[in-house]
A protein has these predicted regions:
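Membrane-embedded alpha-helical transmembrane segments of multi-pass integral membrane proteins
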Residues: 41-51, 71-81, 85, 115-122, ...
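Long, highly hydrophobic alpha-helical transmembrane signal-anchor segments
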Residues: 31, 35-64
Length: 205
């Protein structure tokens, strides 16, 4: 019996390890592409609104471009470190480490979508305040329009990122997770031999 299970352990281990590494490689590539997308958006805003800030003499448009540049200073400050972190990411994580990293990523993007709604709402609040504040009407409208634009983009960005990561995990990672059984001795692979289920808990991942 032991001679039978010894090679079975190694076959089963590599049947999990190989697709797990592939999943992590794909997850890292997704993060890199997302950060490049965020960085591209920030760069575009620097160029377009930078020109606008420099050439528009006054009025609502001036404050709109001003806020776009300032806001995307934060975006580029997130995109560059995010890309570097993804580039340095290791695809050789254990299943438990991969699941933790995946759930953390999904949670971050999901929380961010809620924050993005707050940014959009703040933009509408500023526009509303502009109606009763004639002295700062242009500034409030310009800043408000910028927050609506930037918040709207980030909402679509974060929601799209969450959906991409979540679908990717459902397609492969969570299927791998279902082949693992938790027991008092740790994590083990689980098979069905014939019609009777069999589990072995001494193979640690």
């Amino acid at each position: 019996m032991k001679l039978f299970f010894f090679p079975l352990f190694f076959v089963s281990y590599f049947s999990v390890a190989q697709p797990l590494q592939q999943f992590n490689e794909e997850r890292i590539q997704t993060d890199k592409r997302l950060m490049l997308g965020l960085g591209s958006w920030a760069t575009s805003n620097f160029i377009v609104s930078g020109i606008g800030w420099a050439t528009v003499p006054s009025g609502e448009a001036l404050y709109f471009h001003q806020m776009n540049v300032l806001w995307n200073t934060v975006n580029i400050g997130l995109a560059i470190p995010g890309y570097i972190k993804a580039k340095k990411g290791s695809p050789t994580l254990t299943l438990a480490e991969t699941i933790r990293a995946q759930k953390k990523t999904e949670k971050i993007f999901l929380i961010n979508t809620g924050l993005d709604v707050g940014y959009i709402s703040s933009g509408f609040i500023l526009r509303s305040l502009a109606k009763t504040n004639s002295d700062r009407q242009d500034q409030l409208n310009g800043f408000g329009n910028s927050l609506i634009l930037q918040g709207g983009f980030l909402f679509l960005f974060d929601l799209t990122a969450f959906v991409i990561h979540n679908r990717h995990a459902k397609k492969s990672l969570y299927k791998l997770e279902s082949t693992i059984e938790m027991s008092s001795t740790g994590l083990g692979l689980k098979w069905n031999l014939g019609t009777k289920p069999f589990s072995r808990n001494q193979l640690f991942l």
